[in-house]
Curated annotation (Swiss-Prot):
The lineage of its organism: Eukaryota, Viridiplantae, Streptophyta, Embryophyta, Tracheophyta. This is Probable plastid-lipid-associated protein 3, chloroplastic. Residues 85-96 have a biased composition (Polar residues). Residues 54-146 are annotated as: Disordered. Pfam families: PAP_fibrillin (PF04755). Keywords: Chloroplast, Plastid, Transit peptide. It comes from Arabidopsis thaliana (Mouse-ear cress).
Length: 376
């Protein structure tokens, strides 16, 4: 460094002391007001360095020293809490859950294997606290659960046909609704081969609804003021291959019943060929008392029948005598001519409560006698 301040012709203002190479060179400058001079002095200043320690462990440090060093987070706290247990059971797994900020939530203990062995299974409850699909649900009279979708469809079908006089008074909207429900039930048919399940097919079936055009005159007669269609039913006997259709008409004075007996042949597991043989007209059942309504509707006008009812009371004894006389008479049988009584019947839905059949362009919805569907 001394060579930087050496000049060929030193000025008298510049005084350079002799330089000892063995000493540390430290320049100093002094400025006087009268003259400008530079002086260089040798003031050794030892260099001091702060102690630098590497963050990496040296080979001399043992593993125990590394384990003893504490690692802290940004708040100066240790991640391991002193209150946490030192060890966990063998059958317990600790799940550390962090939130969206990276902070730990409370650990959840999950037992392996038999966590729910001693606890009850979770209950499936609705918003009112009731179990869904449990054993506590109310069952229908036929043993079907109310929440069963098939039972709900059957209940809706029974509600839709109620008050339609077996379909005679059903409007276009009701007919469309009934047809839609029938299609849904047919898609869920639990018995695709009804003729192979006689325990379900056999028995007495009560008509709920029909769209069969040949029954319209009969249903129209039941819409008269003093005559009602009391019931239309069908009895099936697969052992003897016999079907019996029965109709009962009710009047204030008597009940009239007639039936049609047919034999059938099995064409497929769900279809039969029906051949009607004869019709039977049973003797009327005379009522012990005249059962007149209070009024009847004729052309939109309500006509009172109270006076007629009072005048017929003396005739009740005569009606009882006629009933006893006719009760012992045999039924009148009428054969069907030719093949006019032939038809076919296809069962598209069958269970222990409901049967849906189609035949000759007609639709028949029937409920088993004694079913809860008849009470809806």
């Amino acid at each position: 460094m001394a060579t930087l301040f050496t000049v060929a012709r030193p000025s008298s203002l510049l005084y350079v002391s002799s330089i000892n190479p063995s000493k540390t060179f430290s320049p100093s400058i002094s400025l006087k007001l009268n003259s400008l001079s530079f002086s260089f002095g040798y003031r050794p200043k030892p260099l001091r360095f702060s102690k630098i320690r590497s963050s990496l462990p040296s080979e001399s440090e043992s593993e125990s020293d590394l384990d003893a060093s504490a690692v802290t987070d940004e708040w100066g706290e240790k991640p391991g809490d002193a209150n946490e247990p030192d060890s966990q059971p063998d059958n317990v797994t600790v799940n550390v859950i962090t939130d969206e900020w990276g902070e730990k939530s409370g650990p959840e203990l999950e037992e392996s294997g038999t966590r729910f062995m001693e606890s009850d299974p979770p209950r499936n409850e609705d918003e009112w606290g009731g179990e869904i699909g449990g054993e506590t649900e109310a069952d229908a009279g036929n043993g079907s659960a109310v929440s069963d979708p098939t039972w709900e469809l059957k209940r809706c079908l029974a509600d839709s046909v109620y008050g339609t006089e077996l379909g005679f008074k059903a409007g276009s909207e009701v007919r469309a609704e009934v047809l839609e429900l029938v299609n849904q039930l047919e898609a869920l048919n639990p018995t695709p081969a009804p003729l192979e399940n006689p325990e379900l097919l056999d028995g007495n079936w009560v008509l709920l609804y029909t769209a069969f055009s040949e029954l319209i005159p009969l249903l129209a007669a039941g819409s008269t003021p003093l005559l009602k269609v009391k019931s239309i039913s069908q009895s099936i006997d697969t052992n003897n291959l016999i079907i019996d259709n029965s109709t009962t008409l009710s009047s204030p004075f008597a009940d009239f019943s007639f039936s049609a007996t047919a034999s059938f042949e099995v064409r497929s597991p769900s279809r039969i060929e029906v051949s009607f043989k004869e019709g039977t007209l049973k003797p009327p059942v005379i009522k012990s008392s005249v059962d007149l309504p209070e009024s009847v509707g004729v052309f939109g006008q309500q006509i009172s029948l109270s006076l007629l009812k009072q005048s017929l009371n003396p005739l009740q004894d005569v009606a009882a005598n006629i009933s006893r006389a006719l009760s012992g008479q045999p039924p009148l049988k009428l054969p069907f001519p030719g093949n006019r009584g032939s038809s076919w019947l296809l069962t598209t839905y069958l269970d222990k409560d409901l049967r849906i059949s189609r035949g000759d362009g007609g639709l028949f919805v029937l409920a088993r006698e004694g079913s809860s569907l008849l009470e809806l």
